[in-house]
Amino acid sequence: MKPVHERSQECLPPKKRDLPVTSEDMGRTTSCSTNHTPSSDASEWSRGVVVAGQSQAGARVSLGGDGAEAITGLTVDQYGMLYKVAVPPATFSPTGLPSVVNMSPLPPTFNVASSLIQHPGIHYPPLHYAQLPSTSLQFIGSPYSLPYAVPPNFLPSPLLSPSANLATSHLPHFVPYASLLAEGATPPPQAPSPAHSFNKAPSATSPSGQLPHHSSTQPLDLAPGRMPIYYQMSRLPAGYTLHETPPAGASPVLTPQESQSALEAAAANGGQRPRERNLVRRESEALDSPNSKGEGQGLVPVVECVVDGQLFSGSQTPRVEVAAPAHRGTPDTDLEVQRVVGALASQDYRVVAAQRKEEPSPLNLSHHTPDHQGEGRGSARNPAELAEKSQARGFYPQSHQEPVKHRPLPKAMVVANGNLVPTGTDSGLLPVGSEILVASSLDVQARATFPDKEPTPPPITSSHLPSHFMKGAIIQLATGELKRVEDLQTQDFVRSAEVSGGLKIDSSTVVDIQESQWPGFVMLHFVVGEQQSKVSIEVPPEHPFFVYGQGWSSCSPGRTTQLFSLPCHRLQVGDVCISISLQSLNSNSVSQASCAPPSQLGPPRERPERTVLGSRELCDSEGKSQPAGEGSRVVEPSQPESGAQACWPAPSFQRYSMQGEEARAALLRPSFIPQEVKLSIEGRSNAGK
């Protein structure tokens, strides 16, 4: 009878049987459980590159050929401290397969021709041995073009054995990644075929057609006890943690004065840490280096990245791609922190002013520094586009919840933490047109002044249009009657003033219409009331006025119709507009008090008592007529605006001397809204409130 092991092998397929290994077979080919090379290629690749992946447990190797000692029956895992590294020369074909070498423990005489990077016609140098620690190393190069050139001594001496003969001339192509970048990355498994090796390589490399590679790379920074850190450029999804770096020398040329001005602006921001304040200094030093001569690719300021408590100097391209390590151990490695650090030294040196609580300013006017460049009188296509323009149109009282806007500031002035910080008298520090990011804060912009003179404050601005001027808006008169804004007539204003009590109708005659000093505004000169008080106001050309016997009119009827869908006539010199003022005011203050302050001009939707509140919504004394009477209220506008929290702008001469009198007069006025009207408007659910 046959032995037991012979009978068991007969039941196995031929490939599973343990065939005896003869010296002829060993001399002819070298075989491995996971890699096989034809015998015809063995002689050509007998001294080629050794590439082996993570072998499975219990994998057997059979060795032989070219003077190598035959070692059989040994597992690969038994050679845990020996690594064999061989790298192709500089003539490596760019169209070759990916040069990803995943080192695994190998015996000293293990010599196998690998099909992973096999390329006919290329000679590879002899193999060299290096005593390396048990941790696996991974060298990643580009499959599309020549990878980075490694500077001398790229491997720290503690990693190499003193007797190791590893010349750096044989390792010109591979860039080591730091251990912190390889913590979360697992080496790709060994593939039995070259086509399988493409699965992992593109995620860690970049095509040469997208971004140019460096001809030489120097370490960006060295951490104590770590290998040099190199950043590889990639536009593809990162399989390994990559930091994008620009082409060599793509940095701006800035004067020391500009860097100093940015430093002072950053130092004025009290919320910065000392490390963040050092960014500008480090940036200035890097820009003054010889490598700062650019290739015309825009501003690329140097940015510091905080990784695992170590400060690494990187570079930031116009397309910022900063990735955090795979396993973030500390908050400093978060992507949000790196973005904040990048924003502090961004291209235009924008200073982000901390958004503060609004404080009462002397005039309580939301002043915005105007856009001195201005723009043409072309009409916007819609109200949303109007808000995105350079604030030359649609200037209305500002909502407190507006997003941050970009606004140019006067020369040599920077807003930091809500305060104007002079950065010097040199006019070249901050050229006109350079954008400064300023938080939308009323008290900040109310104090914004030019260093040379004190001009007239700009009119109140807003990026939202008042909804009560929109066609179809329902207006409640002081008599309780509801009308659409486009259906209002002169008698509606007269009756509302009579019923309200304490009010009187005044006529405001237009005597002159001029262009304002502020872009996008017109200055209207009126003669108001019996005292013939001369009043001048600045309003947007699309602002509607109510003219006796004519209806709504504006300086730009077409634009008013486009923005509000409200039919308008053209306002001309000699037109008499409706204005309502308080009867209790003396003659010398009528022209100032008949218009309420911006805080009092909000629609009744904001008022808790929903009462009819007088001429604050009917008109202002400069000839601007409100769309309804004393109790005008927007009940259901056809085009609601989220930011329509106030009516039109108060004039530049507005003062608050009569604010208390108007408040007292409002408290004396009863509500003229019947209960039936309330139920019809608000619904039955609010009847008990």
From Swiss-Prot:
Q: Which residues carry this modification: Phosphothreonine?
A: 330
Q: Where is the AXH domain?
A: 457-588
Residues forming coiled coils: none
Return the annotated region ranges for Interaction with NCOR2 and ATXN1: 20-197
Give the primary localization class.
nucleus
Where is the region Disordered? Answer: 1-46, 185-223, 242-297, 357-405, 617-647
The family classification in the record reads: Belongs to the ATXN1 family.
Function description: Chromatin-binding factor that repress Notch signaling in the absence of Notch intracellular domain by acting as a CBF1 corepressor. Binds to the HEY promoter and might assist, along with NCOR2, RBPJ-mediated repression. Can suppress ATXN1 cytotoxicity in spinocerebellar ataxia type 1 (SCA1). In concert with CIC and ATXN1, involved in brain development.
The protein's name in its UniProt record: Ataxin-1-like
- Gene coding for it: ATXN1L
